[in-house]
Amino acid sequence: MRTETEEIRDNLKYLSLLARDYPSQAAAASEIISTQALLKLPKGTEHFMSDLHGENEAFVHILNSASGVIREKVDIVLGDTVPEGTRAELATLIYYPNEKLPQLKERCADEEALEQWYSETLLRLIDICRLVSSKHTREHVRACLPSSCGYILDELLHAHFEDHDKDLYYGQIVGSIIENGRADKFIVRLCELIKRLAVDKLHIVGDLFDRGPRPDVIFDLLMRHHDVDIQWGNHDVVWMGAAAGSPICICTVLKTTLAYHNHGMVEDCYGINLRHLQRMAEQFYGDDDLTIWMPHTDTARGPYTPGMLHRCAVMHKAITILMLKLECQVIDRNPDFKMQDRDFLRRINWEKRTVMVNGREYPMRDMSFPTVDPADPTALNSDEKVVLQKLVQSFRQSEKLQQHVEFLYAKGSVYHIENGNLLYHGAVPMTRKGSFAVERFEGHAYSGRALMDYCDERARRGYFAPEGSAARQSGQDFLWYLWCGKLSPLYGRSAMTTFERLYVEDTSTHTEVKDPYYTWYNEEAVCRRILAEFGLPGASHIVNGHVPVQEKKGESPIKGGGRLVVIDGGFCRAYHEKTGIAGYTLVYSSRTMSLRTHQPFESAEKAVNENLDILSQKNILETENHRILVEETDEGEILREKVHDLKQLVRAYQLGWIKETRCDDSVW
C-alpha cells in the first residue's frame, strides 16, 4: 500500500495542473472549506420526463412551472393571505414574464397604482426566490444571477435583519429600482432565477422527435438548460442517422413527418428542401388514389385544405416506396440484423396482387408501384437517385439540425445511471424465460448491459466515423436498426409493422409483439436483477419511457414492486385519448420521490391570458427517512475526490514539490 507522499509524488503532473486554478495553499484550503460545506447541503431536485414528441407548448409550460413545483412555492409563501386569483397571476408571471408583464401593467389605473403593483410584486417574488434558493449556497445563487443586476438581487436575497428593519431596507431598495425605471428588468430576472433554482437537473428519457409540431423549439430550450441529460429513444436515433446522411434514416424520418402532416417543421425550421421530392411524387403518384396515404391531422393545428392534404399524401407515398427499397438494401448488407423477413418488396406477388407476411398470403390494398421493377424491386430509378442525393445534401447542410443532433450525442446515451436511478428509454431485451436475450453483432455475443454499451458505441460510429468509411456506413445502418430492430433496446418489439398497416387490410398483421421484458418488468426480482446487471443495489430505481401507460384502463406506471417507474404518460397530443392523461414528471427531491400526472394543456395563449395551468396530481412513491444530502449523491462522490486532490495539493505545497505562485491570505 502506497504512503501519502508516494501517492502525491505519483500525482504530481495532475497536481501541477490543479495548481493553475489554486496557486497557493490559501486558495486550495479555501476551496476545500467551500466544497466540504457544499457536501452538507440537501441534494438538488431532479425532474424526469420522457416521450416529448415535439409537443413544444406543453413542454415549455411544464419546464416553466417546474411541473407544478413553482405554484406550490407561491402558495407556501403567500398562503391564504393572498386571493387564489392573485396567486395564479403571480405564478403565470413567473412562467411567462415577458408575455404576462405587459398585461398586468395595463390594468394599473395610473402611475401611483403601477408603482404600488411593482412594489408588491417585487417583494413577493423576492420572498419566493428566497424560498427556492434556500438549499443552495450563496455562491451558487450568485453564479446564477445576471451581471447587470446581480449585486442588488444578491443583497435582496441574502440580507440579514438583525441590525436594521426588513421592511424599511427592502422598501428603500425596491423604491429605488422603481424610481430608476428598472422594475420590469428586475421582475423578469427574478422570474427567471426562480425557475432556474427550482430544478437542479433535468433528465429526458427519450423521444424528443416526431408527431408534435416543434421539436426544434424543445431542443433550443434544452440547449440553454443548465444541467440536462438525454437517454436516446428510437425516434431520436433515426434523426441522428438522418443528420449523419444515412439515406434510409432520412426516408424514415420524412415518412413519419409526412404521416403526421408535419413537413412544415422540416422545411421551415430545419431548412430541408422537399421540392425535388414533391416534383417526383407528383410525376409518378399524382393521379393515384391516395386515400390510405392521407396524413393524421390535428384539428388544433388546422384547418387543412384539400391541396395541402394532397401534397402531403403524394410525398408520403413517394418517400415510403423509396424507404422500402432502401430497407431491403440495409437488410441485405446486415445479415446480423436477422430482418430478412422484412424485405417486403421481394415478397409481393405482382400478378396475384398479394404479399407474404409471416408465411401467409394477403391481398395488397395498393398496387401502384410505377418506380419498382418487379425483376429488381430494390433498385432506385434515376429520378429517385436524384431526389435521394438532394435530400442527403439538404440534411447534411442543415445547420440547426446538425446543432441539435450534436447536442443529442454530447448529452445523450443509451442509458444513464445517477443517484441510484437507472434511466433508459426502451427495454433490456429478455427471453420468454426471463433471462437477458443474447444477440450477435460483428462476430461477438452481447446481452444485458454489454448489449446497451455496444449499441451506444456503434450508434456513435454513424456520426463520428470518417466520411466514406465502412465504420460510418455500419454505424448508420445500425442507427436504423435501433429504430426498429427486434432486439433493439430502444424499440423492444418484434417488428415495426409500417408496411402491414399501409398495405394489408387484415389487422392481425399490424400487431407489434412487445419484448418479453414488458411482461417480466412487473416482477420485482427481475427488476432487481436488471439493477444488479448495471451495478446498482436492489433499493435503486429504473426509470423507463417508450410505452404509454394507459391510466384510463387502470394501468399503473409503477412496476416491479416499486423498483421501476414508467414515465411515458402520453405527453404527445396524439396519445391523450389512449392514455387518458397528458404525461408524467417524476420528481426526486431531497425528501421524496413523487410522480406528477398531468392533464392536457390547452395552449400557451390561454395560459398567459387566462392564467390556465396544467392540472397535475401528485403521488408520493417514496419518502426518505432523512433528508438526502449532497454527500450521499454521485455529485458528492466527485466533490469528495476533489477535496482529496486539493488536500494533496496543499501537502505538495508544504513539501515544496510544487511552488506557490501567489501567496495571498486575502482569499480567507
Residue map of PLM features:
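Feature recognizes metal-dependent phosphohydrolase scaffolds
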Residues: 1-668
